[in-house]
Amino acid sequence: MHDIKWIREEPEALVRALVRRQVAKDEAVALRDKLLSLDTARRETLTKLEGLLARRNAASKEIGQAKAAKDEARAAALMDEVAKLKVDVPELEQSAKAIEGELDGLLAAIPNVPLESVPEGKDEHDNVELKVVGTKRNYAFTPKQHFELGEALGLMDFETASKLSGARFVVNKGPLARLERALGQFFLDMHVEQHGYTEVNPPLLVRDETMYGTAQLPKFFDDQFAVYAGSTQRAIGDETDAERYWLIPTAEVPLTNLVRDSILSEDELPLRFTANTPCFRAEAGSAGRDTRGMIRQHQFTKVEMVSITTPETSEEEHHRMLACAEAVLQKLDLHYRVVTLCTGDMGFASRKTFDIEVWLPGQNAYREISSCSVCGDFQARRMNARYRPAEGKGPRFVHTLNGSGVAVGRALVAVLETYQQEDGSIVVPDVLQSYMGGVTVIAKA
């Protein structure tokens, strides 16, 4: 969320940022003008309200003075004035609240401002490759896709999952289920033991304000799963809605909100959290995409990393987080590349994002397995998350970062396709064998 003071002082900076975000210039200008108009109306209304409140207080005192002076006519006139003010003040308060709500709604719908170092572009085709790590393996046979391998092994069952839950679900069984669990545990162990993250086991159900804090709401309302404890489904933002929860789309949501409504001391920073959780997404805009296999599912497992830093250290932390995500792929000896997302492809809350794309031999394509984003104070403003600088100045907003470390389901896909053998069996990567009870190969029973 943006500071209206910044927009008031640098309105053209907002327009430039939105245009870089691939918003049409006339739309950006119209939005700027609407924001400034609402801001002016809000400030004028508040000024008028302050004047009425001051006059009401003064008139109340003057009534006592008039009565003491036995000036009944003046006392009566003042009482009439106070009575009118008691009507006018609530009306003006309602007006101020309505303007504030409209302004906040517009501000909440504006994406983060991209850093100048972010390449400009419309979509994924304009992303910039930073580096390629490892080499593509050569196979003496045509590599199969993960779902072909899993189904042939009798360990990956989409048909039964569809009976249970519908499309975009899977049932993994036996050693394949254990391999998926091993991947998540391996990632967690690396991040905790080698990368300095604190493991957290967060709730999977969160409230409106938690989703708002990380900017999943209101922007991505249609891509979420809501859970209702009662039968009444109320509108988003309804303050009486104490029975609705949201299934987390990523552990970024609860982990980042751990610092909501708090003032930290600078010596506590950086804070680094990690969690391995199920994640739930409606995939509302993905009709027809990746309909087979585990690439795009309604429920998947992901290890998440979240960092809370000062503004001065967030860029360095961003590169550190990327290195942590890369490290787990290097340990698995998976070929991948790193790209910088362009302005038209980066996430709503991000000011800069690095994607790691792992090579899938069966698909003959790179696919995203991690996104590492720095959000600046965009989420912190929504959460009111601040810290007190060491030099004793007033509280400042923290910077937040998040990254996949990495997506467990997609890592399973990558391991299956990379480590497949001609007979359809899967070699278990060396670093995972201790998590697999010494199993070295997964083959059909």
Curated annotation (Swiss-Prot):
Pathway: Aminoacyl-tRNA biosynthesis; selenocysteinyl-tRNA(Sec) biosynthesis; L-seryl-tRNA(Sec) from L-serine and tRNA(Sec): step 1/1
Subunit and partners: Homodimer. The tRNA molecule binds across the dimer.
Protein name: Serine--tRNA ligase
Biological function: Catalyzes the attachment of serine to tRNA(Ser). Is also able to aminoacylate tRNA(Sec) with serine, to form the misacylated tRNA L-seryl-tRNA(Sec), which will be further converted into selenocysteinyl-tRNA(Sec).
Family listed: Belongs to the class-II aminoacyl-tRNA synthetase family. Type-1 seryl-tRNA synthetase subfamily.
Domain notes: Consists of two distinct domains, a catalytic core and a N-terminal extension that is involved in tRNA binding.
Biological processes, Gene Ontology terms: selenocysteine biosynthetic process; seryl-tRNA aminoacylation
A Pfam family that the UniProt record links to this protein: Seryl_tRNA_N
Residues that, per the record, bind L-serine: T250, A251, E252, E304, S404
One of the record's GO molecular function terms: serine-tRNA ligase activity
GO CC annotations on file: cytoplasm
Catalytic activity, EC: 6.1.1.11
Catalysis performed (reactions): tRNA(Ser) + L-serine + ATP = L-seryl-tRNA(Ser) + AMP + diphosphate + H(+); tRNA(Sec) + L-serine + ATP = L-seryl-tRNA(Sec) + AMP + diphosphate + H(+)
Keywords of this entry: Aminoacyl-tRNA synthetase, ATP-binding, Cytoplasm, Ligase, Nucleotide-binding, Protein biosynthesis
Family matches, as InterPro entries: aa-tRNA-synt_IIb, aa-tRNA-synth_II, aa-tRNA-synth_II/BPL/LPL, Ser-tRNA-ligase_type_1, Ser-tRNA-synth_1_N, SerRS_1_N_sf, SerRS_core, tRNA-bd_arm
Top enzyme category: ligase
Binding positions (ATP): R281, A282, E283, E368, I369, S370, S371
Entries under CDD domains matching the protein: SerRS_core
Keyword Coiled coil tagged: no
Subcellular location: Cytoplasm
